[in-house]
Amino acid sequence: MTSGGTLDVHKFGSLQYSGAQMRVLVAALDLFAEHGVNGTSLQMIADEIGVTKAAVYHQFRTKEAIVVGAVEIELGNLEEALEAAEADAGGPEAVETLLNQVIELAIGRRRLVGTLQHDPVIIRLLGDHEPFQQFMQRLFTVLLGGRFDARSRVRAAMIAAAIGGAVTHPLVTDLDDETLRGELFGLTQRLLGRSY
């Protein structure tokens, strides 16, 4: 909390990682998507970027820190659109831009999205990670028109599951990105109770 009583907001877009840390995080994201967190060792990450396991450990003391950092850099891609939508008090154009970016990120990182939604280690870590919880609350408060009560939280969980499930489901693997994007945008608008 700040001295004024408002919640300190963790801005993912402002996180600073060194070049070495970014190499670890990028390699880890790909390996997590392929093998899951438990199936990815620090040695595998080290081998992927051509360094020793000790070099990876020097950048991040635990695999959990790598998981959190990797998720934060991905969510950082949404921070600018989220801030714009918050500044616009949830105006339709800003919300549409934010929703488009959420969908674009999900489509562009399909394998990772599946891992984020189903890997038990990631689910546990993010469930306990306050900055992630704050980010998701900010995101869905904007998308749901300023509400984040119990009903809104259930809607948010359903929408997140719907987007993540839709981009990774075997029924849509043959769809091109443009078709999937258009269908997903329209259906998500309905789930949000919005129409543009």
Predicted segment positions?
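N-terminal intrinsically disordered/low-complexity leader segments
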Residues: 1-19, 30, 147, 173, ...
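Helix-loop "lid/cap" segments that line or gate small-molecule binding pockets
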Residues: 100-107, 118-121, 142-145
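Helix-turn-helix
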Residues: 23, 27, 31-65, 69
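Hydrophobic recognition helices of helix-based DNA-binding modules
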Residues: 78, 106, 163-167
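Secondary-structure edge/capping motif, primarily at the C-terminal ends of alpha-helices
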Residues: 85-89, 116, 120, 170, ...
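Hydrophobic/aromatic-rich alpha-helical bundle segments in the mid-to-C-terminal region
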Residues: 93, 113-114, 125-196
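Hydrophobic alpha-helical connector segments
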Residues: 65, 69, 80-114
